[in-house]
């Protein structure tokens, strides 16, 4: 998305939410300009800030320019440099429409795109239709997308909204209702500033919005983070990150297994994805729990052995396995991969890499017993220099909220299928130095 003629100036003041006084750089004259955002923008529109102005198309308009972007000092945190923030409130919808029409949508090819779609008592930004799923290609999928522009950044984290918005709460509740009626629903946060990759609800300013987004996520509404390449005169979506709930992933996993891909094959793909994503430092310790998360680790162990990398499996309970996990553990056992039960005396300090497969995204509550001891040992060794990798999500974190009192601190977290909300909420940033997502062919429904 590109603006026409653009000039630069210095922000002086904002007499009201519609206009601002700006000193033009090229002439030194003070010009009254239209502000294309009625939000507060208090942390952006400060005296002396550099701004970008787009020339108005209508020569008879009272204001000759629109204020569309502003330079924010320390964008991303106190140690960061300045960066442009686009504050044009009309830009996100234009940008997302271009992105959709250009094939950017991450969940299939769209066959129809309609803006301003009426649903319930709201107008949702986009109604789309898409081709059916692999097992039912004749089906028409109905999709609703509500776009929100994010211009509020605090210490490298994006937040929405920047002011209380009952309209935004209403949209979330309508989307939750639509999801219950069979629509695929998305909130698309368009992040119109560089270096910011995610958005959190601004509960300090609007607690009700935080409650509404939680209810929407529980209903199956998905989240898109649309990162932008931001210049004073143009915007371009450069990256899309999709988030879903743990329940959506559970349902999608079951659907895929029943209709498309056998469960053992999916587990092998998950383990192979983790294996291929990591630069392994030998020897490798694999800390395995009791569920399918552990099964991914057993696949990794087999692939490491095939590649000549020494590894050892540490089991929370060598008597309990999921069905598919037990299948791959038996392969490891037959091939002579060493294993032992994790105890209070277990010392992992000799290992170059530790793979955390203790608890998966379905974990809720508090970590107890030997799992807590294993997490503390992994973190101790991580602080001594071991490279720590978490499979799907860091053990101890809730997959939906990202909260937890005892959790693994990883150098890398390898998400499987799609990112879950817990990868970007709660204590996720504290737990994960880096995170990547691997698509293994799960059909998200």
Regions of interest found by a model, annotated:
Residues 29-44:
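Beta-strand/loop nucleic-acid-binding surfaces
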Residues 42, 78-115, 134:
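Acidic-basic catalytic patches of nuclease active cores, encompassing PD-(D/E)XK
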Residues 192-239, 420:
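Domain-level recognition of nuclease-like catalytic cores that cleave nucleotide substrates
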Residues 240-284:
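An N-terminal, well-structured beta->alpha segment
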Residues 234-256, 352-445:
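YjeF_N-associated NAD(P)HX repair module
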Residues 276-357, 368-390:
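Nucleotide and nucleotide-moiety/phosphate-recognizing core
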Residues 9, 124-132, 138-161, 175:
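Conserved catalytic cores of phosphodiester-cleaving nucleases, focusing on short active-site segments
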Residues 156-166, 176-205:
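Nucleic-acid nuclease catalytic cores
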